[in-house]
Amino acid sequence: MAGPWTFTLLCGLLAATLIQATLSPTAVLILGPKVIKEKLTQELKDHNATSILQQLPLLSAMREKPAGGIPVLGSLVNTVLKHIIWLKVITANILQLQVKPSANDQELLVKIPLDMVAGFNTPLVKTIVEFHMTTEAQATIRMDTSASGPTRLVLSDCATSHGSLRIQLLHKLSFLVNALAKQVMNLLVPSLPNLVKNQLCPVIEASFNGMYADLLQLVKVPISLSIDRLEFDLLYPAIKGDTIQLYLGAKLLDSQGKVTKWFNNSAASLTMPTLDNIPFSLIVSQDVVKAAVAAVLSPEEFMVLLDSVLPESAHRLKSSIGLINEKAADKLGSTQIVKILTQDTPEFFIDQGHAKVAQLIVLEVFPSSEALRPLFTLGIEASSEAQFYTKGDQLILNLNNISSDRIQLMNSGIGWFQPDVLKNIITEIIHSILLPNQNGKLRSGVPVSLVKALGFEAAESSLTKDALVLTPASLWKPSSPVSQ
């Protein structure tokens, strides 16, 4: 018969499954073991974990829990302890952490090696008697699916790993002192694991909670998009393999802080690339990228004195119009104006690892600056290759080339004509006027603050079939062990 623990586990897994079925993420931040170790190591430093180790009350613990658990009643313990003036940890180090998948699914095992040198003073010898102590604290990172709040990650089951304790005398002295040191070490064997559990484990749990809170704050940092901004929120966390995965929703806000669009449900499941020893990966859906591009490239209008700005293009336009209507071409003076209006917002597409931006353009040609009506109006479906690149922690989009995929004659004062006759020159004009302006807006890039916050100087981008992926570009530089 299934026990209550099995029932609780099944309920937790079912709750997590229902949450995931209801909320489809539009972005995912995947953190590999290297990032987890680095962030937790830093939190242990910030929580003064080594100071806690140095303050372990070794002597008191030996009195309270002697070898075998027998109370101190004038036994051998008292005989040993009366020869000790003081006993304390002299130096303490927390060595390189390890993060591995647990035997239980959706859990991570964190191993924290502890390295200490302790010493005691005795009237039997003038020098301090020192011995080396090593042990390993272990804890489990798991998902808390309790009904009291949203699913979150917690660290639990912290204790010293079985059989990891090693105590060794550093320097041999006289026979009597060596025998005393051996008795002290024997008394520490049952005491030290309890000290680590009671004194250090709460610090480890607090450090993990601090790390998790920092990660949640990190993903919520607003991303500036011209006058708008993009914000992410945690939908639910997950543990897969040796990674922590934060599934995110997103929202677009205007300059007043009003939400203009929610992205809590992706149209399709995101393609999740494997980390392959990459410290972190941020996957952002096509829908969110599309909205970000649209926020930067809002509809706008350009009025250009073509003969002054692009004289060669003005000459070619006049020649092309002359093939349609010579009288209309003759009307084009030195103040001829081309008006370009972008309609709505651009459409962003990802197709087999390649990105494209499509936009609707209205183009009008006026014979002079005094003319009130255009010679003709064209509707153009244009597209450009979109290429992402990074500069430090800035993500930048650049539009390469532009093509007029479809041209329609919307209005004409020179009679009906086939607009494809003007396709080459119209594409040239759009490329020369519109593309530099839009790339100028995109050139400032989008700051991705989590890159430096996770310990990297730069990022690199790539595309899957339906998402933009950011990964670190610089080599990983692990922090030094926690020591004092």
From Swiss-Prot:
GO terms for molecular function: lipid binding. Pfam families: LBP_BPI_CETP, LBP_BPI_CETP_C. Keywords: Disulfide bond, Glycoprotein, Immunity, Innate immunity, Secreted, Signal. It comes from the Eukaryota. InterPro entries: Bactericidal_perm-incr_a/b_dom, Bpifb1, Lipid-bd_serum_glycop_C, Lipid-bd_serum_glycop_N. It is found in: Secreted. Residues 1-21 form the signal peptide. GO terms for cellular component: extracellular exosome; extracellular region. SMART domains: BPI1 (SM00328). SUPFAM superfamilies: Bactericidal permeability-increasing protein, BPI. GO terms for biological process: innate immune response in mucosa; negative regulation of toll-like receptor 4 signaling pathway. Glycans are attached at residues 48, 264, 401. May play a role in innate immunity in mouth, nose and lungs. Binds bacterial lipopolysaccharide (LPS) and modulates the cellular responses to LPS. Belongs to the BPI/LBP/Plunc superfamily. Plunc family. This is BPI fold-containing family B member 1. It comes from Homo sapiens (Human). The gene is BPIFB1.
